[in-house]
């Protein structure tokens, strides 16, 4: 039998256990825990434990900044060492774009949806085969073959554009996604064959055709941020669409981006990038011959509001630029595995494919140090979804 003193000690321990709240750890202890987490997934899971943990997370200076490489492997069960297999995706789905923790996915029959990589929430968008606002075009799929279809243009009989879901050209279509993590608002835009532009905003009943008067709109690139869609057109102008409820208003930059290449410079890609401040940048991926040697380079330009001319930018401060996403993110200090400020993150397809630099890389993702103009190819943890873009979890920006 337990003694009187033993019972008293047991009751005291039970009382202490009932009164202590394990989630209310000392803020200093929680900050130390957060600073040891390198993965955006682990950081996200920790911050949503309870309101107290989330409040402390917001005060952390060293929040994990860890861009992850996104690769699509279909239904393949094999994953290399150090790689992470993401569940919930099949061979039929393809990732078109990302924003924070969200991915823009498309299935056969042009079925679009957005998917939260961390919470697994899925939001289905209207079918592209349903009626499209702005009219004049429609999508049709071939019966009994969901890989093939066609777009019917304004002239109907003479304006039919076929597509193959598995074609490389199809998977290189421009697409952007913007999600406001606070309000839940979102906007999507994508181009069919880089000529027909469509958009969808939360609350719309259908997709909207942005090709006015049936004219094709050929683009170099586009970006979407804070309810604005930025287009870099083939005539080197920037066109901006503002999303306001059911209305779309457009404005055009009257000062085109005219970059004249030197005989030693060869541009591979042109990218429009929106900084955290809202400033618009244009980034060029190119190669340049220097003393009989070719170097892979990135040039950054911004508009001088006084001279109305585009000027080179040689520093982006404490930010890092995600080339595939067309945005910058805050990098408070240099982290391991090549994660550092004043750098441009890219994938193999973003630079010239015939360059000798590709022979020395240890992965298909790299970063360009703006200060030194040097490229490194760090070996990283990969997320298997899409082979041509970085995924940057929305945990620190």
UniProtKB/Swiss-Prot annotation:
Pfam families: Beta-prop_KIB1-4 (PF03478). It comes from the Eukaryota. InterPro entries: F-box_BR-signaling, KIB1-4_b-propeller. Residues 20-68 form the F-box domain. PANTHER family: F-BOX ONLY PROTEIN (DUF295)-RELATED, OS07G0183000 PROTEIN-RELATED. This is Putative F-box protein At2g04810. It comes from Arabidopsis thaliana (Mouse-ear cress).
């Amino acid at each position: 039998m337990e003694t009187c003193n033993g019972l008293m000690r047991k009751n005291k321990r039970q009382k202490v256990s009932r009164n202590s709240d394990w989630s209310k750890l000392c803020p200093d202890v929680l900050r130390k825990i957060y600073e040891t987490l390198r993965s955006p997934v682990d950081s996200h899971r920790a911050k949503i434990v309870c309101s107290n943990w989330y409040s402390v997370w917001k005060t952390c200076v060293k929040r994990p900044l860890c861009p992850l490489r996104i690769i699509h492997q279909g239904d393949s069960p094999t994953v290399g060492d150090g790689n992470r297999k993401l569940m919930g995706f099949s061979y039929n789905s393809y990732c078109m774009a990302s924003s924070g923790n969200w991915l823009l996915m498309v299935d056969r029959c042009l079925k679009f949806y957005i998917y939260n990589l961390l919470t697994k929430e899925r939001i289905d968008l209207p079918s592209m085969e349903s009626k499209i606002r702005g009219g004049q075009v429609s999508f049709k799929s071939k019966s009994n073959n969901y890989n093939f279809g066609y777009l019917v243009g304004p002239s109907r009989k003479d304006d039919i554009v076929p597509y193959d879901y598995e074609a490389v050209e199809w998977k290189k279509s421009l697409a952007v996604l913007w999600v406001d993590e606070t309000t839940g608002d979102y906007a999507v835009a994508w181009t069919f064959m880089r000529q027909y532009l469509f958009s969808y905003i939360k609350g719309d009943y259908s997709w909207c055709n942005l090709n006015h008067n049936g004219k094709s709109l050929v683009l170099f690139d586009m970006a979407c941020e804070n309810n604005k869609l930025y287009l870099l057109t083939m005539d080197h102008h920037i066109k901006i669409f503002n999303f306001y409820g059911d209305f779309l208003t457009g404005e055009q930059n009257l000062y085109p981006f005219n970059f004249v290449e030197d005989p030693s410079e060869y541009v591979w890609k042109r990218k429009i990038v929106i900084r955290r401040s809202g400033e618009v940048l244009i980034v060029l991926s190119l190669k340049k011959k220097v003393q009989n040697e070719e170097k892979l380079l990135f040039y950054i330009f911004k508009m001088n509001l006084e001279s109305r001319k585009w000027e080179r930018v040689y520093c982006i401060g404490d930010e890092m630029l995600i080339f595939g996403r067309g945005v910058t993110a805050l990098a408070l200090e240099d982290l391991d595995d090549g994660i550092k400020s004043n750098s441009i993150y890219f994938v193999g397809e973003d630079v010239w494919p015939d360059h000798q630099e590709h022979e020395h890389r240890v992965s298909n993702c790299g970063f360009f140090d703006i200060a030194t103009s040097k490229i490194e190819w760090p070996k990283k943890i990969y997320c298997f979804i899409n082979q041509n873009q970085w995924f940057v979890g929305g945990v620190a920006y």
